[in-house]
């Protein structure tokens, strides 16, 4: 049974391993990624964001988080599922949790940066109502997709 928990430092190696797996696979790893993966507490949580972990037993099988851009906007970050566990709806569980948390934080918008190679993820975001927008202010050189979801009407 999959449960979603808030980030705990004991799972830092799993958070890093799972994210580097997909970043390296698609040759997308950048210094900004490594800053977050090396210090999720300091770079995300202490700045007002959050990270969630999907757990089966004691095994971390997925991650996702919200990076606080400002009081009204959060970036969906580091969403991944262990390849062995893909296709089981874990991404949906993590995305639901992030969007619920964004609502609690009174976010008006959640946005994300991605890469056009990641078609499965992009389709999922589209199903949730994320819309493609012009790529601006991307923290990643490899980000060729930006999507946004307005939450303002849901509050």
Question: What spans do the regions from the language model cover?
Answer:
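C-terminal "cap" of GNAT-fold acetyltransferases
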Residues: 7, 108-122, 126-128, 134-155
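Extreme N-terminal starter segment of soluble prokaryotic enzymes
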Residues: 1-3
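Conserved glycine-rich acetyl-CoA-binding loop
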Residues: 59, 74, 79-96, 103-105, ...
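Acetyl-CoA-dependent GNAT
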Residues: 6-77, 82-84, 95-97, 101, ...
């Amino acid at each position: 049974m999959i449960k979603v928990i808030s980030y705990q430092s004991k799972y830092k190696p799993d958070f890093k391993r799972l994210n580097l797996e997909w970043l390296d696979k698609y040759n997308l790893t950048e210094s900004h990624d490594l800053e977050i993966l090396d210090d999720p507490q300091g770079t995300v949580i202490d700045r007002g964001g959050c990270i969630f972990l999907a757990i089966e037993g004691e095994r971390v099988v997925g991650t996702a988080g919200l990076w606080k851009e400002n009081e009204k906007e959060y970036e969906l970050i580091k969403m991944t599922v262990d390849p062995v566990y893909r296709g089981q709806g874990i991404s949906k569980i993590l995305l639901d949790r992030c969007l619920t948390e964004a609502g609690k934080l009174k976010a008006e918008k959640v946005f994300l940066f991605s890469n056009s190679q990641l078609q499965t993820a992009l389709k999922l975001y589209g199903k949730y109502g994320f819309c493609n927008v012009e790529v601006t202010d991307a923290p990643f050189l490899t980000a060729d997709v930006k999507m946004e979801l307005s939450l303002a009407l849901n509050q």
